[in-house]
Amino acid sequence: MTDNVNNAESWAEHMRSEFVTMDVEQALQTMTAEPCVNHVPTMTGGFGAAAVRQFYRDHFIGQWPSDTTITPISRTTGDDQIVDEMLITFTHDRVIDCILPGVAPTGRKIEIPAVAIVRFEGGKVTREHLYWDQGSVLVQAGLIDPEGLPLAGAEAAAKLKDPTLPSNTLQAKIEAQPVPSSGCLG
């Protein structure tokens, strides 16, 4: 149990350095000598201390809008791993390289259900993999029109916050649309 507590404390300190103190070197002190950060949907991050330092300095720490909130939803812990489910909310008022690389601010509110899988060695972060639905982000940013596509926008975050909201709404939406003919029969 001690490892789980130490890992949770290390992860909390890591998150504080990323989002509260916004201190790259402090973040790296919570990590092993050869860490890996991988934001899977956008393929951003780095491998090794130098690459992670550059990513944090140039593309992550300090780039988040001032209204960013991270709301924990659930946590699963093991001897050397934590899996956190969370809701990340912000107003897209600046370029955020790790979420919407190269996309000019849209001024839109973005709510992202996300999962972080964090592995530890000796009480320090060695692997940090983040997953989220980039389609939902692109819909909320106004970059994709969801009409006719099996994509959710902010509804995905709303459903995470309130499990009593209806499920299967995309299926109903798609089923209500006429299926175009292939023209093969005539």
Named regions from a protein language model:
Residues 1-186:
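C-terminal and inter-domain tail/linker signature
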